């Protein structure tokens, strides 16, 4: 999604003469992480195309969005090494993390040391620097939080029940079961809640979800709606009172769903995974809870149910933070300035 924003950005494309090559080998989400002869053949073709286009264009700067670890990193290692062999100036932009989890492996450490040498790096948020600190001097790092297009806030009718929204793929590691357990705690306390899960079924299936909800007697207050997009998705955001995202997903860096929730003036409750603490201001725009902690989730949700004025104030503060830092225009201008700085630094 962020790559498309950059590709389509008038601000960036008017500032530079841009040429784009798609380096993705996966056809869809289910294809990510899988190998095969087809991908090897396509990768070989990609390398030839990169070499050809680089010779033809002679760019001032090559911008690459690599993967942090595993087979996908090994592929991107070859791409960056090819560009280095061609004496190109390179900036890499990370939308994922996990380097620090592999840096003590001899082979990976060797590759990372070679990969990051003489590179400029763009990170999504300040605290993600710890992931690359072993290999990259901070002077070579640029911070560029993501941004999203703005939408109109539509008025909604008051609801009797307090509406909780979870918006993401139905993956266990996104904290689905933790939120379900928190809802069970709140129901036992007699809190009038409605919790809506919106997202594509994944390692949590629809049948499994319904089975758990029925066993915990939550079918009157917990609902799953499957994947929703565009206006249908926006309708859930506009009707919610708070947004809850208790993720412990390894690759979580800078969830755009939090920005979408903040734009709609929703207080956000999430974890300290990845760059999330740089998005949510603790106690001001929402709360950060410990991972795997349904009890903490329930306590924070209950607090916002019992303090509607504070809930509204947090939502307002989140909206203001979104407008100040996380609009697409802010992101595009940050990227433009960073790319200009990178080009200038390589000329020194």
Regions found by a protein language model. Give the residues of each.
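Short hydrophobic beta-strand element within catalytic cores of glycosyltransferases
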Residues: 263, 267-270
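Conserved acidic donor-binding segment of nucleotide-sugar-dependent glycosyltransferases
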Residues: 282-283, 287-294, 303-309
